[in-house]
Amino acid sequence: MAHSIWHEKIKSFLPEHYYGRINHFLDEAYASGLVYPQRENVFKALQVTPLEETKVLILGQDPYHGPKQAQGLSFSVPEEISAPPSLINILKELADDIGPRDHHDLSTWASQGVLLLNACLTVPAGQANGHAGLIWEPFTDAVIKVLNEKDSPVVFILWGAYARKKKAFITNPKHHIIESPHPSPLSSYRGFFGSKPFSRTNAILEKEGMIGIDWLQ
């Protein structure tokens, strides 16, 4: 499922047998219709970014619900897939903030310690938020609580009202929060553009004596 250290820490914030409930939910969901991402990628964010290496969280809401888009990392799509509108705006802000990045696949961010987590880890094809409120929120809230317990600083990047509500779980004064409106076309001009989250994150990390993220990689 998830990286083993993640697994043990997350369990401490969940009711007993919650992992069993998740597996039952996944069995039923994938048996009853088309669900994104592919099942082997549901926990990809936790598999490719170990807890001990996580220094940034970018929280999304749920996976892309179009064909071949979702890959288990928030806002990221496979390289051969056209960038969805929110990712287009993220890359536009990145270009204005630091420089141009042509890649749509954000896996290189994940490998540098950026946890690309969605609050819901699955979605029915064509139904945005179709699995919201069913199983995932206690699990992904637990991920945030685990990060909150880290001794080393974490930068939490929270875009949009939904993500910003998760500030309630970030109580450790060692951590930092960068928040703005969501990069979606509906809200990007209300304060996402010009918010410079990438350079601000690196400034925080470097001030804390940590290596910044190569956002253009």
From Swiss-Prot:
Q: What does this protein do?
A: Excises uracil residues from the DNA which can arise as a result of misincorporation of dUMP residues by DNA polymerase or due to deamination of cytosine.
Catalytic reaction(s) noted: Hydrolyzes single-stranded DNA or mismatched double-stranded DNA and polynucleotides, releasing free uracil
What InterPro entries does the record point to?
UDG_fam1, Ura-DNA_Glyclase_AS, Uracil-DNA_glycosylase-like, Uracil-DNA_glycosylase-like_sf
Q: Which CDD domains match?
A: UDG-F1-like
Keywords recorded for this protein, A-Z: Cytoplasm, DNA damage, DNA repair, Hydrolase
Gene it is expressed from: ung
Question: Which family does the record claim for this protein?
Answer: Belongs to the uracil-DNA glycosylase (UDG) superfamily. UNG family.
**What SMART domains has UniProt attached to this entry?**
UDG (SM00986), UreE_C (SM00987)
Q: Which GO terms describe its biological process?
A: base-excision repair, AP site formation via deaminated base removal
Q: What is its EC number?
A: 3.2.2.27
Where would you find this protein in the cell? Answer: Cytoplasm
Q: Which PANTHER family match?
A: URACIL-DNA GLYCOSYLASE
This protein's source sits in the domain of life called: Bacteria
Tell me the NCBIfam families matching this sequence.
PRK05254.1-1 (NF003588), PRK05254.1-2 (NF003589), PRK05254.1-5 (NF003592), ung (TIGR00628)
Q: Which GO molecular function terms does the record list?
A: uracil DNA N-glycosylase activity
Provide the protein name: Uracil-DNA glycosylase
Entry GO terms, CC: cytoplasm
Q: What positions constitute the catalytic site?
A: D62
